[in-house]
UniProtKB/Swiss-Prot annotation:
Pathway: One-carbon metabolism; tetrahydrofolate interconversion. Keywords: Amino-acid biosynthesis, Histidine biosynthesis, Hydrolase, Methionine biosynthesis, Multifunctional enzyme, NADP, One-carbon metabolism, Oxidoreductase, Purine biosynthesis. Belongs to the tetrahydrofolate dehydrogenase/cyclohydrolase family. CDD domains: NAD_bind_m-THF_DH_Cyclohyd. The gene is folD. Gene3D superfamilies: Leucine Dehydrogenase, chain A, domain 1 (3.40.50.10860), NAD(P)-binding Rossmann-like Domain (3.40.50.720). NADP(+) binds at G165, A166, S167, S190, I231. Catalyzes the oxidation of 5,10-methylenetetrahydrofolate to 5,10-methenyltetrahydrofolate and then the hydrolysis of 5,10-methenyltetrahydrofolate to 10-formyltetrahydrofolate. This is Bifunctional protein FolD. It catalyses: (6R)-5,10-methylene-5,6,7,8-tetrahydrofolate + NADP(+) = (6R)-5,10-methenyltetrahydrofolate + NADPH; (6R)-5,10-methenyltetrahydrofolate + H2O = (6R)-10-formyltetrahydrofolate + H(+). The keyword Flavoprotein does not apply.
Length: 284
């Protein structure tokens, strides 16, 4: 029997209704949630992502600012712009779309964002706080994955979770969130020997490698929850994940589709983080 689909679009719609209601309440009290999105260069995927983020803001009643710059923008100019946004009381979240042009140091830029406005959760202060379970903001993609597990009331405590991919953006924070929820966690990377040995042992399998269809059905435990974070464009123009959906869906108990799984949830959790930043600002 095919796996149950974990529909990120449907879950996002439900959560965004809640976000819009809370946004209306905080706005009525004089603090409209505000998100500034900065994109440097003309990466086509980045343009699509920022457009989706700005539209999502509008849909839930947020104030949004989209700042587009050419790839020639200097690092110091970008840092100066971030400093201005840090000081702007109408802006509660600042997001710099990655990747940045090679002459700009991403780490320097991300560290320049005030931690209380770092709604992506990438600032080292927020990453460190996540490690000890006191994070201001959870990184949006892992946060979205946890919400997906929550939506099916999956018993995470004592479950064996395997994460394929050890990035700072997905793999490492995902491990922290699952650990805090009581799972036994294994992180696999490009040096891992006998990857299938680990993936076949996973009750919860999270894949974030950027390699199309690298996890096939024979690498999945029967009945597992499979969360596919990858989004890859094939030569024929079609999108696919890092999991071979067509074989994995006959083995897994639950699986996220690509597109329409984790992607919409990432944007929804960005909205949630921005809302929470605004609610916090309204109390001060």
């Amino acid at each position: 029997m095919p796996a149950q689909l974990l529909d990120g679009n449907a879950l996002s719609k439900k959560l965004r209704t809640e976000i819009a209601a809370r946004s209306a309440i905080v706005t009525a009290k004089g603090t409209r949630p505000g998100l500034a999105v900065i994109v440097v260069g003309d990466n086509p995927a980045s343009q699509v992502y920022v457009r989706n983020k700005v539209k999502a803001c509008e849909d839930v009643g947020f104030h949004s600012v989209l700042e587009r710059y050419t790839a020639e923008l200097g690092e110091e100019e970008l840092l100066a712009r971030i400093a201005t946004l840090n000081a702007d009381p109408a802006i509660h979240g600042i997001l710099v779309q990655l990747p940045l042009p090679e002459h700009i140091a991403s780490e320097r830029v991300l560290e320049a964002i005030a931690p209380e406005k770092d709604v992506d959760g990438f600032h080292v202060a927020n990453a460190g706080a996540l490690m000890v379970g006191q994070s201001e903001f959870k990184p949006c993609t892992p946060y979205g994955c946890m919400k997906i597990l929550e939506s099916i009331e999956y018993p995470i405590r004592s479950a064996r979770a395997v994460i394929v991919g050890a990035s700072n953006i997905v793999g490492k924070p995902m491990a922290m969130l699952l650990l805090q929820a009581g799972a036994t966690v294994t992180i696999c990377n490009s040096k891992t020997r006998d990857l299938a040995h680990h993936t076949k042992d996973a009750d919860i399998l999270v894949v974030a490698t950027g390699k199309p269809k690298m996890i096939s059905g024979d690498m999945v435990k029967n009945g597992a929850v499979v969360i596919d974070v990858g989004i890859n464009r094939l030569p024929d123009g079609k999108l696919c994940g890092d999991v071979d959906f067509d074989t994995a869906k006959y083995v897994a108990g639950w699986i996220t589709p690509v597109p329409g799984g984790v992607g919409p949830m990432t944007i929804t959790m960005l909205l949630m983080n921005t809302l929470e930043a605004a609610e916090k600002a309204a109390k001060h």
